[in-house]
Structures are given as C-alpha cells and as structure tokens.
C-alpha cells in the first residue's frame, strides 16, 4: 500500500488562498414595520434610507409606493389589497423607483398601471423598463407643431385642428360624447397604420381612469371590431381599483408613449379622464394628512397635471422627430369651465374642444360649441387644402348662431338674412357625424368646399346628410382623381373645381328627396332690356248717349 504523504507547504497555501478571499462583512437590509394600514394607505416605521416613489414590498406580494418621507415614518400608497396588511408586518425596500415594462408587444393589449396584462392573453414580452416619473423634453429638444393629426371629425379638423405634439383638451358635461370624439380619432388612424410608413403611423394609448369595467370591455370590443386594436394599448384603472392605481394610470400611459416617441414614432395618448385622477390624488393626499387647498385639492394638483401633459411634444429632428399628442378629457358640472381642475388644465393645454349638453340633446353630434372651442396651434396644423376651404367656416357658423337667436324674436327677415339662415342650417347638418364613422380629410375638404359654393342650398335640411353620403359615392366613381390629388396634399385646382361642380349638378338631377321631389337648380331668369319689351297701346273711349 502506497504511503500517504501530505506537504505542509500545500496546506499552508490552501489556507492562505481561502483566508484572502473571505469577507467578514454581513449583509445589510433595511426592514420597516407596518404601524397602521387603512383606506389604501400604510404608515411604516423605519426605512431611513427609502427614496421618494420607491417600491416597497409587503408580505403576500403586495407592493406600495413611498410618498410621505417623515422623520420617524413613511406614508405608503398601497397598490393592491391593503386589507391583507396588519400591524407589525415587515416591509422591505426593493431599491427600484416606480417603473413599468415597455415594448412593441404592448400593442393590442390591456394592461394595468404597473404594466401587467389583465386581458387574459398571457404575459407580454417587454424590451426594457421605463420610470413613470420622467422629465419632459426641454425647449431645445422640441420643434414647433406643424404636422396635422387628423381626427376624422369635420368640426374639429376644420375649426379646431390638432397637430402632432399638441395637447388638446376635450371638455364637457357627462354624457356629451367626449369619449366618442377620442375613439373616432383612434379609428381614423387606421388608414395611416395600414400604409406601413413609420412617418405616417400613429400608435394609440387609451388610459381609462375610474370607469366601469363593462365600459372598458365595450371600448376594447369596438376597437377590435373596427380593426384599431392592433395599434392601440389600453391602460385600465377601473372604478373598482384602489385610488393609487387611478393616480398612476396616466403616468403609465405617458411612460409607454415616451418609449415609442424616443424611437422616432408618433403616439396619440387619451386620458379619460383627468378629473377622476385629480379626485383620486385628492383622496390620497388627504389620507396622507397633506394640507388641503381650494376644493380640498392639495397644493400640487396643478403640478400633477402639468408635469404629465408637458411630456407631450414634437421632438427635434436630432432626436428622431417623434411625437406625443395628448387628448386629456375633463368632465364639468353644469357646463362650468371656471371650476378649479378645468381652469388648471385649460391653462396647461394648447386649446380645448368644448362639448355642450344642449347641443347634444338637440341631436347636433359631436356637440361642439364653436364659440368657446379653440386651437392655439391653428392653421399650422392643417393641410393647405383644408386651410383654404375652412378659413371662413368658424365666422359663418358664429354669424348663423347670432342670426338664429335673433330670428326667434323677429318675424320678418330680409332676403339676405333668410339666405344666410338657410345656409347655416345646412352647414350645421353637414358637420353632424355618426359615432365610429370618421371621415378622411379629402372627403371633408370636398364637402366643405361644395357647401361654400352653395351646392347644398336647395337640398332640404333633413336630406343634407344623406345627400352628402350619396354624393361622395357618386363622386368616387366619376371624380376619383380629385380625391387622389387632395389625399396627396394638393389644393383644389380650377380644373378640379369644375369637375366637382359638373358632377354635383349631374348627381342632383337624379337625387330624390325624402318627399320624392327632385333637387334641381331652377335656371335664373334674366330681365329684358327696355328696348326688348313690346309695348301695347290701349285706347279707352267712352260712348256718349244722345238725348
């Protein structure tokens, strides 16, 4: 048997190698303790090094966001079921600031404000994580808003145009069609998406805040049926969710939008609606014992919305020329736009579309009040063709509204006023659109130009919308080249105008009104000159009887 020999030098070397790599440091971990948990807020003691907006982990997988950083405790907004927490539970830091996963795979999906899928279609492959609270682009990183974003709604595209990178407020009472306007805008991006051209495509993000789950499901179904879900992401924080989710939902949508914007893409974000976010933030602030201000809102509620909406921008060419267009929705009470939140958001945005319940109830939909609605970008966000035909539209409608109010008290109107009143009535009908039926820009331009030329003047008011629809079908077959020219960005040429007028007259000769009478322009009768009038001389004689 071989003799076992052990070298003392080898043993000494092995011990030296082990001791040189050994570290006597103990792992350090901050652990806090729950003092109380109620109404979605947890008070935690300890955690002296916690960061603002840091994610904290509670037992059972519940997470929270650190908000109030006080000397002896931390106020935490619980994102989950706070009823699972109890006094004495341990709380651990994660070291991560609030962020969500982002990526191309989020298109067509429904997620919560943490980026987790809630549509039952499985996990989503993310490209990276993006912090929710990011600094908005600086002044030097932006460029002016000059590229139109067509909504498909004539009243908006003609009078209050929206450009890529703009923030346009949609404001009005409940049940006035605010969501319908935004959904139509999403549907109108389908044609651009199908081109496959990155410079034309618009990715859409719909942020649902405090809505019923059934309403969100119905919206998703509408987008899917119309073929718009493939380029849309829905961020949902329904009414049943905790206030923390409703507060964070818009920031989650903005983070996802910024990811695509910095890749050079164009994004449309709809916040439906920021009134509910402000109410959720008010509830959180009051529960955190922050001092209340006007209408019990905290002092930084303006900053809440300004730092969110300032993230909408058109980036400079050096940064890829991407854009975020924001359509925030605000709900008013009794058309009161002077309330705290409406005035805040009006001062932040680049214009507003004001929807009025009286117009909505009269069947004028979208119920846009032209006098109050405005776009601070204006004609810069319109094509040349639209700018030319829509130049006087706002003034014509304003004059019609004044004349309409006067006509209710005046019995006799002169011929010019009657003509203006009748044309205004037809113009109002022309601007009415059905829900989920956006109209391409070339169709809008042709309709508005023909209206300005008086093509609708002798069409009965109740037949105007049907006349327009059937006229476009006819022109699509007989003047298709005109549509193609306008879609390519060209203005209406003299030749195109003659083609449209001739085709319209031909269509009128065959159009039947509701009562079955044809619509034909009566030829004007020219007055004869004095020399052309045949004069008859009449001789009157009186017979005198003889006596």
Swiss-Prot record:
Annotated site, Required for activity, chain positions: 373
Alphabetized CDD domains for the sequence: ATP-synt_F1_alpha_C (cd18113), ATP-synt_F1_alpha_N (cd18116), F1-ATPase_alpha_CD (cd01132)
Binding site for ATP: 172-179
Record carries keyword Hydrolase: no
Chief location: membrane
Subcellular location: Cell membrane
GO molecular function ontology, one term from the record: ADP binding
A Gene Ontology term for the protein's cellular component: proton-transporting ATP synthase complex
InterPro entries, A to Z: ATP_synth_asu-like_sf, ATP_synth_asu_C, ATP_synth_asu_C_sf, ATP_synth_F1_a_nt-bd_dom, ATP_synth_F1_asu, ATPase_a/bsu_AS, ATPase_F1/V1/A1_a/bsu_N, ATPase_F1/V1/A1_a/bsu_N_sf
Alphabetical list of Gene3D superfamilies matching this protein: 2.40.30.20, ATP synthase alpha/beta chain, C-terminal domain, P-loop containing nucleotide triphosphate hydrolases
Membrane topology (UniProt): Peripheral membrane protein
SUPFAM superfamilies per the UniProt record, alphabetical: C-terminal domain of alpha and beta subunits of F1 ATP synthase, N-terminal domain of alpha and beta subunits of F1 ATP synthase, P-loop containing nucleoside triphosphate hydrolases
Catalytic activity, reaction form: ATP + H2O + 4 H(+)(in) = ADP + phosphate + 5 H(+)(out)
Entry EC no(s): 7.1.2.2
UniProt keyword list: ATP synthesis, ATP-binding, Cell membrane, CF(1), Hydrogen ion transport, Ion transport, Membrane, Nucleotide-binding, Translocase, Transport
PANTHER family: ATP SYNTHASE SUBUNIT ALPHA, MITOCHONDRIAL
Purpose of the protein: Produces ATP from ADP in the presence of a proton gradient across the membrane. The alpha chain is a regulatory subunit.
Family per record: Belongs to the ATPase alpha/beta chains family.
Subunit structure: F-type ATPases have 2 components, CF(1) - the catalytic core - and CF(0) - the membrane proton channel. CF(1) has five subunits: alpha(3), beta(3), gamma(1), delta(1), epsilon(1). CF(0) has three main subunits: a(1), b(2) and c(9-12). The alpha and beta chains form an alternating ring which encloses part of the gamma chain. CF(1) is attached to CF(0) by a central stalk formed by the gamma and epsilon chains, while a peripheral stalk is formed by the delta and b chains.
Protein name as annotated: ATP synthase subunit alpha
This protein's encoding gene: atpA
């Amino acid at each position: 048997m071989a003799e076992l020999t052990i070298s003392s030098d080898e043993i000494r070397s092995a011990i030296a190698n082990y001791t040189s790599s050994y570290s006597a440091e103990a792992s350090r971990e901050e652990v806090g303790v729950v003092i109380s948990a109620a109404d979605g807020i947890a008070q935690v003691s300890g955690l002296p090094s916690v960061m603002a907006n840091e994610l904290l982990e509670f037992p059972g997988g519940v997470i929270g966001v650190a908000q109030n950083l006080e000397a002896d405790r931390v106020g935490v907004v619980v994102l989950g079921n706070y009823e699972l927490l109890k006094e004495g539970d341990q709380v651990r830091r994660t070291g991560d600031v609030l962020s969500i996963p982002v990526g191309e795979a989020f298109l067509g999906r429904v997620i919560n404000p943490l980026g987790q899928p809630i549509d039952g279609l499985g996990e989503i492959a993310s490209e990276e994580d993006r912090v929710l609270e990011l600094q908005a682009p600086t002044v030097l990183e932006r460029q002016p808003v000059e590229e139109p974003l067509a909504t498909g709604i004539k009243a908006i595209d003609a009078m209050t145009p929206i450009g890529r990178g703009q923030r346009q407020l949609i404001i009005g009472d409940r049940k006035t069609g605010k969501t319908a306007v935004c959904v139509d805008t999403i549907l109108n991006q389908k044609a651009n998406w199908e081109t496959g051209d990155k410079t034309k495509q618009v990715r859409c993000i719909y942020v649902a805040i405090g809505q019923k789950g059934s309403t969100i499901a119905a919206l998703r179904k509408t987008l899917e049926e119309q073929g718009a879900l493939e380029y849309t992401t829905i961020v949902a924080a329904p009414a049943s969710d905790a206030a923390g989710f409703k507060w964070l939902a818009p920031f989650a949508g903005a983070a996802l939008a910024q990811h695509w914007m910095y890749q050079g893409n164009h994004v449309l974000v709809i916040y439906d609606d920021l009134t509910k976010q402000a109410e959720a933030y008010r509830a959180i602030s009051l529960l955190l014992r922050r001092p209340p201000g006007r209408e019990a809102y905290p002092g930084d509620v303006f900053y809440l919305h300004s730092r969110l909406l300032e993230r909408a921008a058109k980036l400079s060419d050096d940064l890829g020329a991407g854009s975020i267009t924001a359509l925030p929705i605000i709900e008013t009470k009794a058309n009161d736009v002077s309330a705290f939140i409406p005035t805040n958001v009006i001062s932040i945005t680049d214009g507003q579309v004001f929807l009025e319940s009286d117009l909505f109830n009269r069947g004028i939909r979208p119920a846009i009040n032209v006098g109050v609605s405005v776009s601070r970008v204006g004609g810069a966000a319109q094509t040349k063709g639209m700018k030319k035909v829509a130049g006087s539209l706002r003034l014509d409608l304003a004059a019609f509204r004044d004349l309409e109010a006067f006509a209710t008290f005046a019995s006799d109107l002169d011929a010019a006023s009657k003509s203006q009143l009748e044309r205004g009535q037809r113009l109002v009908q022309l601007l009415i659109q059905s829900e989920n039926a956006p109209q391409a820009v070339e169709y809008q331009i042709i309709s508005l130009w023909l209206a300005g030329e008086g093509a609708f003047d002798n069409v009965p008011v109740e037949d105007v919308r049907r006349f327009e629809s059937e006229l476009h079908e006819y022109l699509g077959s007989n003047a298709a080249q005109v549509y193609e020219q306008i879609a390519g960005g060209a203005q209406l040429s003299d030749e195109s105008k003659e083609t449209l007028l001739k085709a319209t007259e031909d269509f009128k000769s065959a159009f039947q009104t509701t009562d079955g009478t044809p619509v034909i322009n009566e030829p004007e009768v020219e007055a004869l000159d004095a020399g052309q009038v045949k004069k008859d001389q009449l001789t009157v004689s009186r017979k005198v009887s003889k006596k």
